Amino acid sequence: CGGSSSSTAPTEVVQLRWFVGLGTGTDVETQVPVQQEVVDAWNAANPNIQVTLEVVPNADAKNTLLTQNAAGNPPDVVGPAGVAGSNGFYGQWLDLAPLISDANYDLSQFPAAAVEAFAVGGQGQLGLPFASFPSFMYFRPSLFEEAGLNLPPTTYGDQYEMPDGMMVDWSWDTIREIGMLLTVDSAGKDATEAGFNPKKIVQYGYAQPWNGAPEWASWFTPGQFLQSDGKTIAAPDGWVDAWQWYNDAAFKDYFMPNADTSALEEWGQGNAFPTGKIAMGQSYTWYTCCLGDVLGEDWNIAPTPSNNGTISNDLNADTFRISAGSKHPKEAFEFMTYLLGEASAKLLVIYGGMPARAADQDAFFATLDEKFPQGVNWDIAKASYANATTPSAEAYIPNYLKARDYIYSDFTPKLTKAALNVSDYVTNTFLPALQAIADEAE
């Protein structure tokens, strides 16, 4: 007898790869096991779409992904990664707009501005909101109290009361003034007093935790180096003045540690705020990862200062992307929306990102309150996110990886290495060098 003519062909199992390493997600103790749980749950519920988790150490991830893409073997889903992590692969991400339309995926669950942040001109909708990292001012209340200063404002738009009772805007000019009052030498003199010794400082009013020149300037005025013609590199309006503010803070007004001081062990080797000897520092929500044990519960957050009456809230945002060369884009989108949806609660906890959905934010901050029980004013973080500015400090530049390395490894350190006429240096050295790097991409 012959076989049955009515046999049904087996359904093909689609194999997907999820590549982790361009951003967070590589910690083998706290992150990889949870990501594997997320994959296992998906695989159990979706026998016809099986996912393999591929975790590559951050230091190797860029080269690994470049090699895979060049060999025609790209992973399907990549992330979490921020703007900087993904810009090194410009033109290699899939436009999600057709998939969003075909799946009738509901974009109204996200703020419109958050969706637009992942829409790249000429490239399409390259991602959807997931983990957000708004920026604001970290501060140590006890140092304000010891100096007899009022604490920073608790709401955007509120003014600050100076020691003489004058009400002033919470601005970068104000940060300079109170930063000097909060900077103290070994004799107890602050940086405004006669006889203050800048070589014997025991407490600084301000320190800039990590980040680099684009972020530093973006907190004064949003902008990007690449101009509208897609070729010309220029410093956005206000950025040179912002960089001069930081240089003066270190070498003229002395309320911020310079590069040499910051590198010392007693000043945190590049992360000074957690030493407990720094009054203020501007950063993002992800910085809660790295506050150490010395501060204890003696820290809180305040609004981003204004500049010329305008507040610029730079936003870091991580999400997932689909490789343009994925052989299974429809299935990859299904898995990606699972990461953005059902699996997001687990993932956001291990990534430290604020949920893009407003409905999920209170639960997220409740978990942070368990870790930091002093009553952090998380309404500041929510307001910073709701009023985030664009373009991102991590905006695209041609030859991005080389350009970024030059900006962060060469230019940024110079801003706090020695007293500098920033305008001259930017005009005569920095911008020509950055333009030459961008031109190499042609």
Regions found by a protein language model. Give the residues of each.
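Hinge/lid segment of periplasmic solute-binding proteins
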Residues: 57, 81-136, 145, 195-199, ...
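Glycine-centered hinge/linker elements that transmit conformational signals in sensory
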Residues: 176-180, 214-218, 228-263, 304
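Short, solvent-exposed loop/beta-turn-alpha elements that line the ligand-binding surface or hinge
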Residues: 97-110, 153-167, 196-204, 223-242, ...
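Conserved N-terminal structural module of periplasmic/extracytoplasmic solute-binding proteins
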Residues: 1-90, 101-108, 147, 151-152, ...
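Extracytoplasmic/periplasmic solute-binding protein
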Residues: 121-131, 135, 163-232
